[in-house]
């Protein structure tokens, strides 16, 4: 921006600026709903890892006649969202792999009733120790693929010619995307077994594929509309698919429109983050500080499922080299 320009001049040609400034912008949570819409709230696993999952929904179902509680057994198609590896069930079945993983979906006539019912679902099972450290996972062989190697030049010669060789380790922590608009979707069943979904997503085709897979219907019968996003920063690429698919599952099961909007606490616990990394590095330098050689080993913490981890790992390596 030139020094003489004001911020108002700089943004005046952006068509959404006035709408955002005056609060007229519509997001998924602002849209008018069809009559009879149900509201969905996911129930999350209480700990980081476990098995022998058991649910008791009797209190939740007794709260209100409109309450429905869906589990993995209610999925008509495949209980799977993962495409690189089949490691991401839509709803946990028997085992769970992270705190907040969806173990059930509650539907009710309004959001308040759905949230109250979700709190009444009792969860039990055998808790297991989680693996939280990428180095530990690598040592155990618990990895998503074989290690990648990228080389350029003769690093051994560079270290031999260097005046100084420095080694060390570095930790780069995870980070929440913290988009202002949380994950949101509205699913509307249509004639002929079709499903229409409005999703706050950066990747509508991924949402379409996920709904098709879970409902067991052709992609041609699934229409996904991506509305204006209230921020995303990469957090609504593959990450938007589970919530839209859960809404679609509820709509498929009940034959009624279903709206699902995570609150902030749910969004921060239930969604993926920027990858944490551990790294060991070795740098060869001259006396005047010029880098002759650099060698680094990265340990990527990809979390409970692979998602976009491979693409992120490749990008990490390309950025270094």
Question: Which residues make up each language-model segment?
Answer:
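Alpha-helical support elements that line or immediately flank enzyme active sites
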Residues: 41-70, 105-124, 185-254, 300, ...
């Amino acid at each position: 921006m030139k020094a003489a320009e004001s911020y108002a001049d700089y943004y005046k040609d952006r068509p959404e600026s006035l709408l955002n400034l005056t609060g007229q912008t519509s997001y998924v949570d602002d849209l008018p709903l069809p009559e009879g819409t149900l509201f969905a709230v996911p129930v999350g696993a209480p700990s980081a890892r476990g098995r022998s999952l058991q649910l008791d929904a009797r209190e939740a179902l007794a709260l209100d006649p409109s309450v429905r509680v869906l589990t993995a057994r209610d999925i008509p198609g495949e209980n799977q969202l993962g495409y690189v590896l089949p490691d991401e069930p839509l709803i946990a079945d028997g085992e769970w792999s992270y705190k907040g993983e969806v173990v059930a979906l509650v539907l009710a006539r309004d959001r308040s009733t759905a949230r109250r019912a979700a709190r009444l679902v009792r969860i039990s099972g055998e808790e297991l120790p989680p693996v939280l450290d990428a180095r530990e996972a690598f040592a155990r062989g618990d990895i998503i693929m074989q290690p990648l190697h990228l080389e350029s030049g003769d690093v051994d010669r560079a270290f031999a010619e260097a005046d100084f060789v420095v080694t060390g380790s570095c930790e780069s922590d995870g980070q929440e995307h913290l988009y202002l608009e949380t994950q949101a979707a509205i699913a509307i069943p249509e004639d002929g077994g079709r499903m229409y979904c409005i999703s706050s997503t950066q990747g509508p085709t991924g949402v379409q594929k996920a709904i098709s897979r879970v409902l067991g219907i052709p992609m041609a019968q699934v229409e996904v509309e991506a509305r204006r996003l209230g921020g995303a920063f990469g957090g609504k690429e593959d990450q938007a698919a589970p919530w839209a698919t859960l809404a679609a599952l509820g709509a498929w099961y009940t034959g009624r429109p279903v709206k699902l909007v995570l609150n902030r606490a749910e969004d921060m616990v239930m969604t993926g983050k920027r990858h944490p990394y551990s790294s060991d590095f070795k740098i060869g330098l001259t006396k005047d500080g010029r880098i002759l050689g650099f060698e680094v080993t990265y340990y990527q913490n990809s979390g409970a499922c692979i998602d976009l981890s491979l693409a992120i790992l490749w990008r990490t390596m390309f950025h270094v080299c």
